[in-house]
Amino acid sequence: DTVFYLKKSNNADWQKVKLPIYKKGGNINLLGFNAAGTLAYVASDYETKVPSIYSVDMQTLATTLVHEETVAEISGTGTLYNGALEAVSFSPDYNRLVFLSDDSEMKKIMMQLYATFGVDDEKTDVRISSFTEDGNQLVFTLSSDRDPGAFYLFNRGLDGSKPSISLLDVAKSEIDPAMMAEMVPFKFEARDGLTLNGYYVLPTTGEAPWPMVQIIHGGPH
């Protein structure tokens, strides 16, 4: 069976503990910590068929369900310049970003970027790749199913300078997003009752009916 050990502080000794969100044979993974180091964020399938997100109090081991997931596994995480985990992404259909607290600094940054470009997390994938140590500047990418994306530098203006966003480079500039087809998620119930998820893509040229090519894969589970 899996055994867990915990240090409640940097100077504390390791202690053997039991986590109430773990069942024998289940899946559990440490994702990261909040900025203060008082909460650990854990993915566990204790109550759901795919891992959901829980916070664990580092002193009391009290657990709180932060996000219940029933469809897709975790596809990524978002951390700040100070190493704090503030977001987790899932892709049940489109990419979905789940913020781990209402006062998340990551959430404020992402809302700024969504508003600036007039997009949301349903059709556009915004990913922060790096920060400066003071958190004032960050590099992010903006992409979608039709656009390979571009790299930008965001100066947040925390040092008194004027906030700005500048283009750094474009990925695969030879591709014209206007000529790319949209990926549309769909799902249906199979004869055995299992819900199957997929995407369909229709050509941007020609006339219907088009020939069908089926590519089978294992997502999003």
What is each PLM-predicted segment?
Residues 97-205:
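Non-catalytic accessory segments flanking enzyme active sites
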